[in-house]
């Protein structure tokens, strides 16, 4: 693009700001009825933020649902703090000798944001929720692919630096098992 000679370093600088932008985008759902859950909250003590949020249903009555947007905003704020810490203290340190120094903050953002979306998107139920099929959303599929990309990237780096190890196989088996477990849980819900 010609913006910089080192794109990975530029993405490292943008990653904490990107996470903070996601926080504000999620908090903007407070002013509309999007990003609410299927879970109805009937306990009056829990019918306020951070757990519940009121929406008006088609009959004109107010019902309280799990505030997915607020929980996502809190989780992404935690990711922002973690990325800022990592950016200011460890960004120039390679993960291991022989690994690249730049790009790790951006990979962490991609992985953590995808994990939050993969987890929380299953609770959403609104007009902007895009189904891929009857039980898995497009956002969940894209999040799983992003986590897979990070897994491939770091597996290649680790294989190059450490050689072939048993924990690579264990890590891949763990990814496949958690992906299968997530799919089964989504299907059963």
What are these regions (language model features)?
Residues 1-189:
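A feature for loop-to-transmembrane-helix boundaries and adjacent hydrophobic helices
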């Amino acid at each position: 693009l010609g913006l910089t000679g080192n794109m990975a370093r530029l993405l490292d600088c943008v990653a904490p700001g990107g996470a903070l932008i996601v926080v504000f985008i999620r908090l903007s759902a407070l002013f509309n009825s999007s990003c609410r859950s299927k879970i109805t909250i009937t306990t009056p003590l829990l019918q306020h933020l951070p757990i519940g949020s009121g929406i008006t249903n088609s009959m004109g009555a107010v019902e309280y649902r799990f505030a997915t947007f607020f929980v996502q905003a809190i989780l992404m704020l935690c990711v922002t703090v973690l990325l800022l810490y990592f950016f200011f203290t460890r960004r120039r340190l390679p993960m291991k000798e022989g690994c690249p120094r730049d790009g790790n903050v951006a990979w962490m953002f991609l992985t953590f944001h995808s994990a939050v979306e993969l987890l929380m998107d299953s609770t959403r139920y609104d007009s902007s929720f895009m189904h891929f099929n009857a039980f898995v959303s497009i956002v969940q599929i894209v999040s799983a692919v992003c986590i897979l990309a990070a897994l491939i990237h770091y597996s290649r780096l680790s294989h190059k630096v450490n050689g072939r190890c048993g924990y690579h196989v264990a890590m891949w088996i763990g990814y496949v098992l958690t992906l299968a477990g997530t799919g089964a849980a989504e299907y059963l819900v």
